[in-house]
C-alpha cells in the first residue's frame, strides 16, 4: 500500500471501542414505512444502561461490531445501520425493557426468511452485555411482504378444494406416533376418515424409519383415504410428512405424493428449516398440494418468558415462508397457550390486516396486503368436552385435531371419529341458532349425546380429564 493510500484511509479514523449508544441509539428517529421494526424484551447485565443495551442489540443485529473498523468509512452507516429508537420499561418486571429497533430494508435479501432471521435473531442473542433477550414481535413492511409467495394456497382455496364450508375442519393424529407398520397405520387412517374426520395426520417425528418406510406409508394412506372418500362422498386428506434429511429427498417425497393424487402433505418447518420450507411451499403451489406445517421444536425457542422468540414471530415467519396450516396451541388442552395472546397470533395468521393491540401481544400494526391466510390448528390433549370452547375460540377457519381424543374411544377409531363429528356439528348448529357456547357448551354436548351412542361413550370416558398444572415459571 502506498503512503498516499495509507494517509487517505486514516483520515477521520480513530481506532478503539465506542459506546454503542453514541451511534445506534437514536430516539429522535422517525420510522419509515419500509423499515422492518422489531420489539425486543431486553434484560441488561447489572450496570449496563438500558439505552446502551438497546443500542447494542441494534448494532449487533445490523452493521456493528465490537470495535471501530476503518472500513466503516467505505460505506454509509447511516443508510444501513439498525436504530434503537425507543425504550420502555416492562411493567411489573425488574430490569426488563422493551427496546424498539428499526432496520433498513436494504439489509435483507428479498423473499428470504432465513436471511431475515440470521440478522435479527443471530449472534446478538449470545451478547455478553445482555442477561437475556427475547424478540416479542416484528413489523414486516408491505414492500418486504410482497417479495414472498406466502402460503401455497390459503384458506379460501383450501375450502374450495375440499368443498367444505361453514365449520371448522376436523383432524386426528395417528397414534401411537411410532412403531406401527404401514398397513396397520393405513387401517387407522381409513377408520378415522370413514368415521367423519376431514383429515388424519402423520405425527411430526414420523419420517422414514425401519418399522415404516415413507413410501409404504404413502401408499397405504392413499389407499385408505380414497376408500374413505368413496364410502362417505366427502373429500378426505392425510398429512403425509415429507420432512427428510435433505431438501432433495423432501422434494422426492412430495413428488410421489402428488403422483398418488393426495390433496395435502406436511413439513416440520422449524427442524426442517426455513429454506427447505420455502422450497416445499413453492413446489406445493406449483403442483396443487396443500401444505400442513408442524411446529416441533417451537417451545425450545419460545417458552422462556425473557429469552428467545415469541411464537407470534414464528407465526409471521411461517406465513411469509409458506404453509396452509400451522399448529397454534389450543388454550384448553395439554399444551401451553393463553387465550388472548393465542388469539392475537391466530389473527396474524388468518387476517389480512391486524391492528396494534398490546393486550393481545401485538406490538405493531401488520398489513399482509392479501398474502393468503393460514389455518390455525388446535391440537394437543383435547376431547369432545372441549368442542364448544374450541368452536367458540377459533371459529370456522381452523382445524381442530383430536389424536387421543379420537383413537382413545373405548369402541375404536371410527366411533371416536363419529363422536367428534357429532359434537362439532352440534356446536356449530347451536352457535348458528344463537346459543352461547361458552355458557351452554356442556349442555349442548349432553343433548347431542342422547341420540349418538358414540358421543355418549366418549363423554363418559373423558368427563374428568383436565390438564391443569400451576405455572412454575
Curated annotation (Swiss-Prot):
Active-site residues, as the UniProt record annotates them: 175, 294
EC number: 4.1.1.39
Keywords: Acetylation, Calvin cycle, Carbon dioxide fixation, Chloroplast, Disulfide bond, Lyase, Magnesium, Metal-binding, Methylation, Monooxygenase, Oxidoreductase, Photorespiration, Photosynthesis, Plastid
Residue list for modification N6,N6,N6-trimethyllysine: 14
SUPFAM superfamilies xref list: RuBisCo, C-terminal domain, RuBisCO, large subunit, small (N-terminal) domain
Gene Ontology annotations for the cellular component aspect, listed alphabetically: chloroplast
Cofactor binding: number and manner: Binds 1 Mg(2+) ion per subunit.
GO terms for biological process, alphabetical: photorespiration; reductive pentose-phosphate cycle
Superkingdom of source: Eukaryota
Reactions catalysed: 2 (2R)-3-phosphoglycerate + 2 H(+) = D-ribulose 1,5-bisphosphate + CO2 + H2O; D-ribulose 1,5-bisphosphate + O2 = 2-phosphoglycolate + (2R)-3-phosphoglycerate + 2 H(+)
Residues that make up the propeptide removed upon maturation: 1-2
Compartment(s) where it occurs, according to its Swiss-Prot or TrEMBL record: Plastid, Chloroplast
Binding site for substrate: 123, 173, 177, 295, 327, 379
PROSITE patterns for this protein: RUBISCO_LARGE (PS00157)
Record PTM N-acetylproline, positions in chain: 3
Residues bearing the modification N6-carboxylysine: 201
Cofactor dependency: Mg(2+)
Pfam families reported in the protein's UniProt record: RuBisCO_large, RuBisCO_large_N
Miscellaneous remark of the record: The basic functional RuBisCO is composed of a large chain homodimer in a 'head-to-tail' conformation. In form I RuBisCO this homodimer is arranged in a barrel-like tetramer with the small subunits forming a tetrameric 'cap' on each end of the 'barrel'.
Oligomeric and partner information: Heterohexadecamer of 8 large chains and 8 small chains; disulfide-linked. The disulfide link is formed within the large subunit homodimers.
NCBIfam families: PRK04208.1
Its job: RuBisCO catalyzes two reactions: the carboxylation of D-ribulose 1,5-bisphosphate, the primary event in carbon dioxide fixation, as well as the oxidative fragmentation of the pentose substrate in the photorespiration process. Both reactions occur simultaneously and in competition at the same active site.
Protein name per Swiss-Prot or TrEMBL: Ribulose bisphosphate carboxylase large chain
Amino acid at each position: 500500500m502506498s503512503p498516499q493510500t495509507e494517509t487517505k484511509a486514516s483520515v477521520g479514523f480513530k481506532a478503539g471501542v465506542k459506546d454503542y449508544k453514541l451511534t445506534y441509539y437514536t430516539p429522535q428517529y422517525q420510522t419509515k414505512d419500509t423499515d422492518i421494526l422489531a420489539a425486543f424484551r431486553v434484560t441488561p447485565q447489572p450496570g449496563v444502561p438500558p439505552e446502551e443495551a438497546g443500542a447494542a442489540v441494534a448494532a449487533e443485529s445490523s452493521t456493528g461490531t465490537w470495535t471501530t473498523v476503518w472500513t466503516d468509512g467505505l460505506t454509509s452507516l447511516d443508510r444501513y445501520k439498525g436504530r434503537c429508537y425507543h425504550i420502555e420499561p416492562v411493567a411489573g418486571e425488574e430490569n426488563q425493557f422493551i427496546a424498539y429497533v428499526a432496520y433498513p430494508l436494504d439489509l435483507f435479501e428479498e423473499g428470504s426468511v432465513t436471511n431475515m432471521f440470521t440478522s435479527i435473531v443471530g449472534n446478538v442473542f449470545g451478547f455478553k452485555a445482555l442477561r437475556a433477550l427475547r424478540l416479542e414481535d416484528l413489523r414486516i413492511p408491505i414492500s418486504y411482504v410482497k417479495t414472498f409467495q406466502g402460503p401455497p394456497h390459503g384458506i379460501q382455496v383450501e375450502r374450495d378444494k375440499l368443498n367444505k364450508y361453514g365449520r371448522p375442519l376436523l383432524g386426528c393424529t395417528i397414534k401411537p406416533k411410532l412403531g406401527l407398520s404401514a398397513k396397520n397405520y393405513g387401517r387407522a387412517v381409513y377408520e378415522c376418515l370413514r368415521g367423519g374426520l376431514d383429515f388424519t395426520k402423520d405425527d411430526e417425528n414420523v419420517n422414514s424409519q425401519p418399522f415404516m418406510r415413507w413410501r409404504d406409508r404413502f401408499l397405504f394412506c392413499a389407499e385408505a383415504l380414497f376408500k374413505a372418500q368413496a364410502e362417505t362422498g366427502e373429500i378426505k386428506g392425510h398429512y403425509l410428512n415429507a420432512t427428510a434429511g435433505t431438501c432433495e429427498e423432501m422434494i422426492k417425497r412430495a413428488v410421489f405424493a402428488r403422483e398418488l393424487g393426495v390433496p395435502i402433505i406436511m413439513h416440520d418447518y422449524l427442524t426442517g428449516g426455513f429454506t427447505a420450507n420455502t422450497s416445499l411451499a413453492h413446489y406445493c403451489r406449483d403442483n396443487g398440494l396443500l401444505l400442513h406445517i408442524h411446529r416441533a421444536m417451537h417451545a425450545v425457542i419460545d417458552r422462556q418468558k425473557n429469552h428467545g422468540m415469541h411464537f407470534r414471530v414464528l407465526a409471521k415467519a411461517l406465513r411469509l415462508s409458506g404453509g396452509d396450516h400451522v399448529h397454534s396451541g389450543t388454550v384448553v388442552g395439554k399444551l401451553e397457550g393463553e387465550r388472548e395472546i393465542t388469539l392475537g397470533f391466530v389473527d396474524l395468521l388468518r387476517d389480512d390486516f391486524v391492528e396494534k393491540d398490546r393486550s393481545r401481544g401485538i406490538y405493531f400494526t401488520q398489513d399482509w396486503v392479501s398474502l393468503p391466510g393460514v389455518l390455525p390448528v388446535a391440537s394437543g390433549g383435547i376431547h369432545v368436552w372441549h368442542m364448544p370452547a374450541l368452536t367458540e375460540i377459533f371459529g370456522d377457519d381452523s382445524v381442530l385435531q383430536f389424536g387421543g381424543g379420537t383413537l382413545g374411544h373405548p369402541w375404536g377409531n371410527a366411533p371416536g371419529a363419529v363422536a367428534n363429528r357429532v359434537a362439532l356439528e352440534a356446536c356449530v348448529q347451536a352457535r348458528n341458532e344463537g346459543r352461547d357456547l361458552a355458557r351452554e357448551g356442556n349442555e349442548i354436548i349432553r343433548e347431542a349425546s342422547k341420540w349418538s351412542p358414540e358421543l355418549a361413550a366418549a363423554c363418559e370416558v373423558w368427563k374428568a380429564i383436565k390438564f391443569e398444572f400451576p405455572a412454575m415459571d
